[in-house]
């Protein structure tokens, strides 16, 4: 009986053992699969969103852009709009000539679509190409020649890696013999690229066990923290932009504007400045653009310049845009208008012997800034050829005038004059200082954020406003007083 029971129990035991073994194998297999890194790769074209053989992905400062470049004749080109807004605004599309104007320290070059005479790619193609849909493209190799950036092109899949920002950039080195950069932070995530020991990666973000990185050839993904070194800062580099040599003075500029509206005003200059001390530059309001073709009016006087020079002062003739017949937003878009203004100014400068030009174009609209910048580039290039200083007046940087691109202006011109006054003006809703100390401090601080301190001249007012507020009324009025008037008013109140 017992023998029979043993015989019956044996198969059951075997089955139980088999069940345990199968279960254990399943658990082991599950655990192995769970912790085994995935081996599947993500297709490069899918990662870079490339849909055809001529599309080129753009990776800028570690970010894959929606914007894409194109291959033309096997070489990478980027749309003009991208180049101008993201890489180098010196590439300026001129609607009148239907070409790209490139202003450098050597002058202005005109790059016409399809013309390789002025500039061409390493492969001999024109620097600028225009597609049938009207889109204008610029060779990235040509852009690199004139722009402060690092750039590399890779094929299979087509992509361009660009860096034009270096502040706060860190890198890490691969320490494992082999490692993978994955699409997401997890061992099952798709592999984007294999990396080898010693490879340098752009370090973007720390996520504990995983770090966000970018490979040298443009793949941004995640790598296990244990596979790389501690991040280290990349040494700051000196900008390699085209060097626009400034014409500067080895002393501080102490400038006064002279409101000169007639020949009589010119004649009064010597008497007005006879007892003036410390001033080494005088800027008379001699020139104004009077119409849409770029005609300028002039009160320039060689005798005025001679007297100023005898007193040890330079003369920087001022040109304004105050005539309503001239609209800089639309009129400066024409190369012929810009050229006409510049030619007349330089002819006047040569005739009267003045030392510089002061540009006082005010109330600029955002739409006109690209054309204004191009005007300044062309003016400075031509003026420097005659050894003339170029200075530009600009309002105090405020949120609503940031579109002035003061840093870009400062790339070309010699001095930037911030008009640190009119904090409160005739139309202000409240009484207040024309130029309070905090207002002036802010002006200087904001200017020196985007340009060297020795390029900034701070304009302060030699006038004030006396405000009148009537009891029970919300309206306020003001009267402008010059220095003498302010002094006399102060003496009256002191005596009272």
Residue ranges and their predicted role:
Residues 492-496:
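Conserved small/polar residues in nucleotide/adenosyl-binding loops
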Residues 254-258, 280-284, 315-319, 357-359, ...:
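Hydrophobic faces of well-ordered beta-strands that scaffold small-molecule active sites
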Residues 282-288, 349-365:
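Short acidic catalytic loops
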Residues 235-339, 344:
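Glycan-recognition patch characteristic of GH18 chitinases/ENGases
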Residues 198, 211-215, 223:
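SH3/SH3-like beta-barrel fold
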Residues 292-299, 343, 366-490:
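Substrate-binding surface in catalytic domains of secreted glycosidases
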Residues 2-207, 237-248:
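Primary recognition of N-terminal secretory signal peptides and signal-anchoring hydrophobic helices
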Residues 222-238:
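Extended acidic/polar, glycine-enriched regions
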